[in-house]
């Protein structure tokens, strides 16, 4: 079991990584944690907002919207096993120095995303909350929301009801299988979605805090077009927004633009 002693959550996954900080410092090497979009660019947005727009940030809502349509009744835009486990797990958010746990998909909000439109979004636990709670001074609450369409949720509920999202091994014809891994094998490969996906993604952070004694709120976000991403690199925008920041992070390490011995989150 992984606990997060630094911020008081049993849900955190960063402790085992942060524990290597001293070893990496002594070895003179750098580890960069979470260099995708979320986590990754969302951490950059947070550091940028604090540096340029706020004296202190009190609230962060991280929003991940995929407004794309791949034409399948049900498919996931990245590893189905990870995606389905993430959605079916209990949610959590950080508020006033401690973690608040929620039931899966319990908290729902609507948001009008620029260039995408109005979407339903649901609160999930996400790992960047763990580091931002430590690294953004003055923070009072951090939440993460991801959009899901009703068709996706209906299919997922049906699969859950018949046991197909279970990670508990079962015996089938003399062999042990994990239902969720079997489901992954029969679903469309996320890598195959690129040429058939249309629409846009919108991923960003709503920041509320103070500047010169006055409260202000801003939304810093990125929009990617699935079809344009496919033209450029041969993948849909979900893979694009994950892979391009990872490449940039690696490039900045290799060129010594980022050169600090130890283990660090991107913000």
Question: Which residues make up each language-model segment?
Answer:
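Rossmann-fold NAD(P)-binding glycine/threonine-rich loop
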Residues: 10, 14-30
């Amino acid at each position: 079991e992984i606990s997060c002693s630094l911020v008081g959550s049993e849900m955190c996954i960063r402790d085992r990584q942060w524990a290597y900080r001293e070893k990496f410092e002594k070895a003179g090497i750098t580890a960069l944690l979470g260099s995708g979009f979320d986590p990754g660019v969302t951490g950059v947005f947070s550091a940028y907002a604090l540096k340029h727009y706020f004296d202190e940030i009190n609230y962060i809502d991280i929003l991940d919207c995929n407004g794309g349509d791949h034409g399948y009744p049900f498919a996931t835009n990245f590893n189905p096993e990870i995606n389905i486990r993430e959605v079916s797990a209990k949610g959590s958010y950080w508020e006033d120095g401690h973690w608040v746990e929620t039931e899966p998909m319990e908290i729902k909000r609507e948001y009008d995303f620029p260039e995408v439109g109005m979407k339903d979004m649901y609160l999930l636990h996400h790992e960047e909350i763990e580091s931002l709670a430590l690294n953004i001074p003055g923070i009072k609450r951090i939440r993460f929301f991801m959009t899901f369409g009703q068709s996706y949720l209906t299919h997922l509920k049906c699969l859950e009801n018949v046991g197909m999202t279970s990670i508990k091994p079962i015996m089938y014809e003399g062999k042990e299988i994990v239902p969720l891994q079997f489901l992954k094998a029969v679903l469309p490969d996320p890598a195959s979605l690129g040429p058939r996906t249309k629409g846009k993604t919108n991923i960003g952070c709503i920041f509320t805090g103070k500047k010169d004694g006055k409260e202000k709120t801003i939304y810093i976000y990125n929009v990617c077009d699935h079809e344009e991403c496919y033209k450029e690199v041969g993948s849909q925008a979900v893979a694009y927004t994950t892979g391009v920041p990872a490449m940039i992070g690696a490039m900045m390490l290799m060129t010594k633009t980022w050169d600090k011995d130890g283990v660090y989150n991107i913000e």
